[in-house]
């Protein structure tokens, strides 16, 4: 993509910027929550591109909030320490020992690295976690596996979000970078799936958009048939399809559904392997992923994007 941009003439670059104007106007002063994950977290060029996207959005008046996972880094650290990692139903099995490593990697490594990349462009990013200033409260989450609810350790569901604890950072013109660890009323600390946390935070902040980066192009109705990629889908229609999705995709799509049902204008699952995918999704008519919208927008014809609707 960089090579393509470098080959554009000055006139062509000006056209690209002009085409983005309606979208820049739409999102100005609006909160956009972005879940940072997938290859965008491990490839150095993609990491730098993501950080630049966040600074670009902030510079043009959008108010980005980043929620990050740390799956690859957590798995790598567990392997280095000789601890076996396990997933059930798309969620990491989290013993007290694993939780301490998750906590250390999320806030001490992934979050700090991203804050540093963003701040290489100026003093924009502030690292925080769900434990700070009462941002998140959580309770134990039981995961349904083969029709049975299963305890997978210190994995939690968010029960409350104190949005005001972030608004001070946002109103100061900063970019919050949020690690997804949350305390519970029972005195325990829980590992929160970052997709789930991003959706809950987007709803609590009355965000205009939720974007979730992943390692696929979006939602497929007939994987691996690439022609079955869905561009736009109604939230309730997607809810009906959740049980048929792969385990790794369920938390992402569940988060999108919940966010839209609770007032977020639209949620997007986009390909984090594409440099500047956030800008492509937000600031172009075509976008690069799957957009989840209220079902009323599917029925009254107000969705104008691509041609593969479900």
Curated annotation (Swiss-Prot):
Name of the protein this chain belongs to: Acetylglutamate kinase
Organism phylogeny: Bacteria, Bacillati, Actinomycetota, Actinomycetes, Mycobacteriales
Pfam families associated with the record: AA_kinase
Gene Ontology BP terms: arginine biosynthetic process via ornithine; L-arginine biosynthetic process
EC number: 2.7.2.8
Keywords noted in UniProt: Amino-acid biosynthesis, Arginine biosynthesis, ATP-binding, Cytoplasm, Kinase, Nucleotide-binding, Transferase
Primary localization: cytoplasm
Function, in words: Catalyzes the ATP-dependent phosphorylation of N-acetyl-L-glutamate.
GO molecular function term, any single one: ATP binding
